[in-house]
Amino acid sequence: LMEEVLRLEHTGVLGKPFFISALKEQVMKIQARALGESGLPETEDNVSLEGLRFLAAEDNEINAEILTEILSIEGASCVIAENGKQVLERFKESEEGEFDAILMDVQMPVMNGYDATRAIRTLARGDAGRIPIIAMTANAFAEDEKEALSAGMNVHLAKPIDVGMLKQVIREYVLIKNHAE
């Protein structure tokens, strides 16, 4: 029986009170470290974002600057929109495939992230239904994650964003998808 048990030598840390999304993030990190190399393009620890292009919805100027700087350091570029309506318009104006993913805040003026995601998913263009949309929000309860997924977002990340977790999500939803195509 002991031979059949996968021993997880790595641990994660959660503070109290903790949210389901934070628990899920820690479990995913532990699993990724325990399973190691899976034959996919790169591992979580050395994911390269070099050359990736992101469209990001972020109404907080400081958060937008931090996100842009993080992505720039990783070799990626980012176009910032201040609300959901601007993201929708910028995506409509873009060439198909211009962006590798959309990083979507949820609480924004003019149009929220849920409505923007629903609108993007209904556009009559080939990439509208398949571009990864990653929720990046302070809304960290299980019902917030459920609402993000039902709006058409691929995954929900709670703020403050952990760079390692963001890279893992990008690996899973952007790099592996591109590798498979």
Give the location of each predicted region:
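C-terminal compact regulatory domains
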Residues: 1-181
